[in-house]
Amino acid sequence: MKKIRTGMTLAAAVALAVGMNPFGSLPGSRVCAEDGTTAAKEVTLRVCNWEEYIDLGDWDEEETIDLESGDIIGENSMVEDFEQWYYETYGVKVKVEYSTFGTNEDLYNMLTLGDVYDIVCPSEYMIMKLMAEDKLVPLSEHFFDTSDENNYYSKGVSPYIRNIFEKNEINGEAWSKYAAGYMWGLTGIVYNPEEVSEEDASSWKILDNPDYKRQVTIKDNVRDSYFAAVGALKSDLLTSESFRNDPDYKQKLVDEMNDTSPETIQAVQDYLQDVKNNAYSFETDSGKADMITGKVLANYQWSGDAVYTMDQAEEDGVFLDYAVPEESTNIYFDGWVMLKSVIGEDKDKQKAAEAFINFNSRPDNAIRNMYYIGYTSVISGGDDPRVFEYADWNYGAEDGEEDTVDYDLAYFFTEDGNSEDYVITAPAEQARRQLYAQYPDADAMDRSSIMIYFDEKQ
């Protein structure tokens, strides 16, 4: 099994944060021709993304991803490669000014205080908030034209993810009208199987389980902690056979997990006080290190960070597992949206912004980003096999390995979820470790729920 790369050089991070090109000049990036006239119109594209959430390049040669369909390596940053690709493809120079943010609330405050960006990458609930506030520009009709070879997103987004973006609405408008997915995952529990049973880790009730007093962490934000608390409080209902077998199970699950009745809010407050008395900490990022160093035995985590945690612990000889709670799990997304206040009617900017989405959705680039940051792209690749090849490259069993499991990913890669072409023969342990975190199985997906956007009245 190959390792997911994490981290970046300080120089590259600082350079991108201030809009510099950390790798020098690009061919064709000069705005003046030799005679002193303008060689081509230049578009400035201001992008704001999560910290450490895009490939910065500068890979070592031994990091080459050698797939059946060809090698992939990040020599330059994704931003640099996009600038060059855009000029070669459209004959127009684009200069990307790349910035980062730490939380969705940080991004929203930056926008409120007047920071100017054309395209940003918030999580699903912030996308819903920006939609509700009428702050976004809809994606163009051309963006969805699959006959255009450069529309990599529409051609390659996972059918499973596309369906979610088309079904979920704000004010009668689908997410897909305004947002294109980037990364996705589920929330769950990273745990030490030497100290914590799989059964205990597979329930949100582990958070206040006295057997793990001061040995478990929970997320320090209202949405994630509220979701976990509702799951724990309604555990008996959510895991009951009658509830699971209800013909309207998925909708009823969403309704239960998004219950904001006064009674439920009070019960959640009381429950979280119990969790506070039991947990090691409420945290945003420190839980990864606490698991790796053994300070805690279980950590409420986003799946991408769960992969990082398991990878890093494994380097120290500690093998951690990942569980998706039986009650329900939150399926989350980060996605690209364009801001009305900046792009407005500027078609040149919109074309560049949509091209940036498409370039990051090209299968080889989706793989580069996944390798570099450890999260899972919404891109399955369509007719391009490389994303599945990459999953197999990462997690497929070695020849002759005996203790294996057939891990079915057809739900993610196909329209109907029924194909034998998307089964990975993986080491058996991967059914509860990195593969399970990065590509949860169909059972985990079935009990996943969107957490809707709550307006100020809620």
Question: Where does each model-flagged region fall?
Answer:
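Sec-dependent signal peptide cleavage junction
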Residues: 20-38
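Periplasmic-binding protein-like
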Residues: 145-152, 266-273, 317-340
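Short loop->beta-strand "edge-of-pocket" segments that line small-molecule binding or catalytic clefts
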Residues: 206-222
